[in-house]
Amino acid sequence: MGTIGRRARELAVPVVVCALTLGVYCLYSVGQWRMMASPSWDLAIFTEAAKSYSQGHWPIVPIKGPGFNLLGDHFHPILVLLGPVYRVFPSGLTLLIVQNALLAWSAWPVTRAASRLAGSAGGFVIGLACGLGWGLQGAVGAQFHEIAFAVPMLAHGGVAFAQGRYRACMAWLAPLVLVKEDLGLTIMVAGLVLAWRRRDQGRRALAESLAFAAFGAVAFVITTQVLLPALNPAGTWAYSLDGSATGAGSSAGGAAAAKVWPSLIEILTFPSVKIATVLVCVLGAGVVGAASPWFALVVPTLAWRFMGSVDFYYGWSSWHYNAVLVPIASAALLDVLGRAARWRDRRSADEDRALADEAGAAAWRAERVSSWWGTGVISVGVATPLLALAATAPLLPMWQLTSSGFGQDGPRAEAAHQAMAAVPAGSAVETDITLMARMVPDHEVYWVGSAKDMDPLPEYVVVDQRSYVWGGRDVTAVGWATDAHPGHSYELVFERNGFQVAHRTS
């Protein structure tokens, strides 16, 4: 009974942290769904991919273009795992819940490891700072993306590194190549870090680590230079190394413009939000975690973002690009705390020696500074992530939960449902972002404009006149459709509260 009770106490803190994280994220996602919040078209795109996988097909995504294979956009075959779940729960909300579960899972190994090093209270603080970390909140706010699968892998792999379980570390990180093409570079850096850490463990350990680094590099080259071009309609990698689109992400294709590279100082500091992003990442590692070689794993992700020309790659408070940085920073902190705990624990052993003889007393005095240093490092490492999270909370997505109106059906909800009901199930429809993800389960959905080369054209056009995608222009469903598809005629079949549905009559 004693063993069972001890085991239960060990698991209590991680269970509470993961449950709290999952609960907060699901509360937010359901609220977003009810409010019809649509930060981008990405949720609809991934919902179409999950729908195709659930039917045993390639991830064909009409939103990107007729017959577009999403594996030619980014390389994320791990998304096939969404198929069975979507088959049971066919909704875009399903993907949001799956993502929340994956992100909450990442707090499990971090909390358990932190509790062993810093006690239950310290474990709770570090685990919560990881689970509700800045980058994970941004991912939840931006809705589903493939990197959700990478977060628990990086968390488990990083904790294994901090605990000296290096083969387990490699086993957890290897599947990252199935999540997104650039993560092969993260594996490469991890292999080099492992080689450095294991440099005194013999040739075999060194060879394993370097082989792992080579695996990551080769995987990156194969996915970007062979697999993605083979699957992309334009026959090329749709994104450059800096993450910016080349114009070849759809069947329309396009050539990348000549790139003028800025100086290293400009890459790192301009605009200044890049400095803030790095600072928040360091604070997430408790500051002291930046001393761990594991912290180097943030470099590939920050590099392609900072070298890019897309403004929202640079920030720290929104979007999903920072999600992979959170478990890396947390694991780096645990790595340093592990060493600090060993310094701290020397004191009790040396104190016993001091009681035995004068030589022991001298040794104890020599070690006491190291012990105090270890205790200080642990204190800073535990407190800093929590303080950083508290200080930045008002700027992060979950702060919206404090608003009294968050999660409530808006005044346009009824009109939105009526607009969707006006389109028969099974029909092909062109639409903007607002209702896109909601229409995927029962319709063949296209982005407004992606179906221009189709024959026949989609039967319906659904427009939200208040959607931000129209840039404030006065758009009507019939007007847009007749302009986009000359020679065809449309009639308005529904209009209410800014939502319009047009039916193609010829």
Predicted regions: what is each one?
Residues 186-216:
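Perimembrane helix-loop-helix junctions
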Residues 109, 129, 148-172:
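Specific aromatic-rich, kink-prone transmembrane helix
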Residues 296-355, 361-368:
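Hydrophobic/aromatic-rich transmembrane helices and adjacent perimembrane loops
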Residues 28, 38, 42, 52, ...:
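Membrane-lumen/periplasm interface segments of specific transmembrane helices
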Residues 93-117:
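Transmembrane-helix motifs of polytopic, lipid-linked glycan transferases
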Residues 15-18, 121, 213-217, 341-396:
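Signature aromatic-anchored transmembrane alpha helix within multi-pass, membrane-resident enzymes
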Residues 1-27, 166, 207-212:
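Start-transfer (signal-anchor) and selected internal transmembrane alpha helices
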Residues 27, 45-69, 77-78:
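Extracytosolic helix-loop segments that constitute the early lumenal/periplasmic catalytic or substrate-binding loops
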